[in-house]
Amino acid sequence: MSESNTFSLSLELLENFEFKVDFDEYGYIITDEPPPLGNGEGPNPARLVGAAVANCLCASLLFALKKKKQWLPSMRADILGEIAKVEGFWRIVKINVEIQADTAAVDPEILNTAVQQFENFCIVTQSIRRGIPIHVELKNKTGATLLSSD
């Protein structure tokens, strides 16, 4: 039996390349492109992808440990993303995530098992690695569809 959950958020253009991304009950963030396109008033989408990957990996490691009643007192991650032109268009071509975790109090056997499993628990990383089908619809103000693509 398969399970499925959905999530939603909304995005609104404020000015230039600055957007308000509304996460409903979680509040909102402002995103922007760096100069010369935008004014750098917030993280750009590529940084959000990097943050999502690293956050999910860290949460997945915690999940794998918590299943065995283990916990990390501290953890941080550093992300280095690389963008490059691919077939004439800018793309994220690599995301390096370095996680530093205080594992001193974790049972070594449980830690070893968690290290082998945690990436499989990460929804974001595994989805990006496999490729995510994305359906795009572009509509004008009257609701007429200008583009529908997969």
Predicted segments, located by residue:
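Alpha-helical metal-binding/catalytic segments enriched in His/Glu/Asp
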Residues: 56-57
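Extended beta-strand/beta-hairpin segments
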Residues: 1-51, 62-150
